[in-house]
Amino acid sequence: MDVPAFRERLLRLAPKDPLVLAVSGGGDSVALALLVKEAGRQAVVAHLDHGLRPESPLDQAFVRALAERLGFPFFTERVEVARIAQARGENLEAVAREVRYAFLHRVAREVGARAILTAHTLDDQAETVLLQLLQGTARATGIREREGIVVRPLLAHTREELRAYLRARGEAWREDPTNQDPALDRNFLRLFVFPLLEERFPAAKRALARFAEARAEEEGVLERQAEARLLPDPRFFVPAFRAAPLLEAPLAVRRRALRRLLEKLGLRPEARLVLLLEEALRGRPQTLPGGVLARRKGGTLFLLPPRPRLPLPPGFRRPAPGDYLERPSGRKRLVDFLAEKGVPRELKPLWPVRAEGNRVVEVLGLYPPPPEEAHMAEALAEAASAFREGEVPVGAVLVLPGRVLRAHNRVEGLRDPTAHAEMLLLREAGPEARGGRLYVTLEPCLMCHHALAQAGVEVVYGAENLKEGALTRFGLPTRARGGVRERECAKLLRDFFARLREGCRSG
């Protein structure tokens, strides 16, 4: 065991003391504690008794004695993990892991530690990768060397290397008898599968560990791209995301984004669940574990819990039969109005309204139209002007303190390929644009996206730009919000290009 190399690796991963050492008493964690001591670092030892085995008090006593011998403060706690798992109806191993890491983080906060060290080895890495592949978790990135403040400095070392290090020092360790139980998947791989693999492929574990390292590097890049594609639709009171940025993403990026969605729901990112979300994106509703309904309505993907909880502010009630709105264009049934606004049928009976009898005077967040809809209406009027002038019908308004600027595309009229509505507004506003909010009928292209970001302008758009959108087409991260008056914005564009095609045929 190369202690100087370990010291250097530890300094890179966790440069500041004190460190929290997760020590169970097994060979790997005992070796970790001894190596940290040899490296000259300051640490505390944390030991959690899961209350799962009658021998656990002996493990605790062993670790306490080790900590005292090394001069490290000792922290311990006992938790009845089985009882918690049974009460929740959850997997025992998953609950044990959750409870264990919660304990370690509490200790870290108490002592002011910036790193928690665990004793995962190269063997653990290989087992995890193979287990992930066999269980269909669709990632197979294995165990990361660093996650938040959790650091795993022994991933390059095998279990046998650490045992040899302990034997050379005459050190003892505890053996957990449950590690010999083949009913547990990880134990089955360790006891039966890997011995067979290594007979034929002696370097199997190192190969799997290298695979995990490469996958983790690739995943980091793709993960950032996937996260950018998850554009929340904040108009609704349930998890909802714009569909087009997901649908237009490359397959590998889209599936990673969908796995992130599953994780946000507290579900395992299994391949079969990713495929269900793909189906939902394409308009075929799917039910996920826990009764969550994934369905697309219009340009939004909804993740509807089995019992959605919508707020009910004072003075509001739930919709009732016969409810209607009195609008300048005439009377409209409430159910039709909600459908027009993209509200899925599961939420219609729950949407908060304020009414006088059956005449609805307010629909929470939707009527009277919020300011963003009024500004988008102005942008639509500008887009209509562009339509009449033979320009691609994109309009925009820039809302600044004390004034509102308006523009529409004038590429043809000015013979200027940069004369997009957004660019014209930025030129007019100059330095005053910073901190403003732009409402535009079509998602900005790359040019406008970069200019708006540089100018510090917030963006709200109507329809996604499938051909040139900075996010939808090219996957650039954005803090924009989309979907405001989407139908009207998209219809204007469809009508324009239909007229253009008709003119081409007539010509």
From Swiss-Prot:
GO terms for MF: ATP binding; hydrolase activity; tRNA(Ile)-lysidine synthase activity; zinc ion binding
Gene Ontology biological process terms from the UniProt entry: tRNA modification
Keyword Metal-binding in record: yes
Keywords: ATP-binding, Cytoplasm, Ligase, Metal-binding, Nucleotide-binding, tRNA processing, Zinc
Localization of this protein: Cytoplasm
Enzyme Commission identifier(s): 6.3.4.19
Segments crossing the lipid bilayer: none
Family: Belongs to the tRNA(Ile)-lysidine synthase family.
Domain statement: The N-terminal region contains the highly conserved SGGXDS motif, predicted to be a P-loop motif involved in ATP binding.
Function field: Ligates lysine onto the cytidine present at position 34 of the AUA codon-specific tRNA(Ile) that contains the anticodon CAU, in an ATP-dependent manner. Cytidine is converted to lysidine, thus changing the amino acid specificity of the tRNA from methionine to isoleucine.
Name of the protein this chain belongs to: tRNA(Ile)-lysidine synthase
Lineage of producing organism: Bacteria, Thermotogati, Deinococcota, Deinococci, Thermales
